[in-house]
Amino acid sequence: MDKGYAYEAGGNIYFDTSKLKEYYVFHNFNEEDLEVGVREGVEEDTNKRNKADFVLWFTKSKFDDQELKWDSPWGVGYPGWHIECSCISMKHLGERLDIHCGGIDNAFPHHTNEIAQSEAYLGHKWCNYWFHILHLNTNS
């Protein structure tokens, strides 16, 4: 938050994607292309400043039964999906990665958000190469 990349709204801490020059690193689209609620059960988050903003820390969530919670400066809560992976990577692999890989379904928003928050925090390029693997579908 001190660097201006995050904001508090509705009890949660959000990453402000408008603060980045290059947010959509894996896709040739922009915020207007994003559709809210495309997936079943996903509701629009009216606390977000921009459609692509994402939660770094939850203190208010529709998941009341979330068991793992910790104290924070913003209240008891838990990390957002993307921050978990960035923290684990940095703790065990350091602040510069050569290669990061995952399924093609993680390119956006997951890996895009990992890059955004990691590079905002570190102040430098985080990962040199990204590999996104396609899925193999079979009949059985």
Residue positions per predicted region:
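Alpha-helical recognition segments enriched in aromatics with Gly/Pro capping
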Residues: 1-140
